[in-house]
Amino acid sequence: MEHPKRPTPKNEALHIDASGRGESSFSVHRSHSGGHEPFAPSPGSSIGASVSMFSSRNSEAEVGDAEDLDGVRTIMMNIGVPDLLADREIQMRYPEFYQFLLAEQPTWFEPAPSNGTVYRVHHTTPLPDNHKKLRKELPFEMLDLMYRFFRQKHVNSQRKRENKELLEANKQLRIAAVQMFTKAEQEEEYISNSLLKKIQQLNQDKDYLVKKYQKDEESLTKSLMANVAKIPDVHGDEAAAEKLMADKQAEIERLRTYCSRAEKSYQEELMRLRAEKVDHESALEQEQELLINTLGKRMSQMNEEKRKLQQALEMAYLNGFVDFDDTVEVALHASASQKYNGNSPNVSANSPVVNTNSPAVSTSSPLVRNTDQQSTSSYRQQLNETAHLHIENKKLVGMCNQERRRSQATEAEVKKLNQRMSKMEAVLEAIRIEAVRTDGPLAWRLAALSHDNSIDEPPHRMLAERRAHGSSPPTVVVQPSTSRAGSNSTANINNDTHPHAQVAPILATVHPTQRATPARNERPDSHY
């Protein structure tokens, strides 16, 4: 089966008409190379790949004319008898041919050469002896047509695929061209806008410089005109010059008179200020003397109060109103030593009085000033000591009040303890009465123990001592023992009288023994 010849142009190119800017203005047409340059696609583009498919010599999709090729071209066909048997369309449309293929299985058959093209089929069997005769039969001619039909069908599918690829490439090229021209327009617009802004800025700068230049020119012109107007006329009248000189001389004389008057008034003011300074200094000295005398009197009063407070503290300490303290003891010793050594040279300095009426006292004398400074320092020291003693006095008063509160609390506790003691004595008396009623020997023992205690100390003294100490005497439970002789006899009598009776314990009140202790106000070193 011969294929129709298709002229293959030597120079085919894809030309884009860029005269317009719309998408419809881009037309794709194939033309000869008359007046246009050939189109050279890039190696990586889809167009180059699709065009390169036509350049392979042994490709299945290549269908060329015999005169364009130098020799015989061989094409391998991938279709065979099993593929024809598997086609349902052949089975339905050509049942006799299908039965022929199924019965004969002509796998040795290959299509006849056409226009210098030799067809080869894969997986062929050896040729039979009468293969030339068999080729002329109708079934084998039908088989040859089927081979060529499937070959052409395959070529058509490849051409459709290539056409589709070309259409896609054309579409991509159109989109790329539109994008390229859009981008070019955007860049052009951006450049034009930026240039327009720069031009506007330059125009504004130009206007500003022109205005500034005009303003500077006007100001310079005005200043020059003013300076020219201020320049005096050198060639003026001599009378005007003489008048000006006379005016200047009169001004100078007036200023000299004013300076002399001002100097005289300043001298008078200076003398007046010096006199006022002397008056103020004398008044200040008198006030200082008055203050010194007042402070001397106050210091004497404070010393008297200090002495009285020391005496009161000493009396309170000696009478026992204040507890023993090392600080108070040292202060009392110091006051006693000052009292015995009172005729010291510093006694006369405790109350200095400055006589302001004496004419011998002068503020300009350095000896008097030194004496005033010493007396002032001594007064300050005495004032500090007086303040310290006043603070100490407040502390002592607070301590006395605290001790008074403690003594009141102690008296309240003593009253409570006395009430408890009276209750305990009543209970003991009841116990004694009960013991007398129940057991005669036990009552006798209690009476003997009470008699012994009453012999040791009088009852009224015992009660006074117990109340003074503020605590009740301890009660001791004494178990009967057989250590004493008298107790042995009593126990034997009791056992004989009551052989099966249990011996009851003895309740005894133990009074503490009074020790000779030094008095509260007595010093520890007075015994020596």
Swiss-Prot record:
Domain of life: Eukaryota
Cited InterPro entries: DUF2046
Compositional bias of kind Polar residues: 472-496
UniProt KW Chloroplast keyword: no
Keyword Repeat: yes
Pfam families, sorted: DUF2046
Keywords from the UniProt entry: Repeat
Disulfide bridge partners, by residue number: none
Protein's recorded name: Uncharacterized protein T09B9.4
Region described as 2 X 29 AA repeats: spans on this chain: 185-313
Disordered, as annotated region: 1-51, 467-497, 509-528
Transmembrane residue ranges: none
Extent of the Sequence repeats: 185-213, 285-313
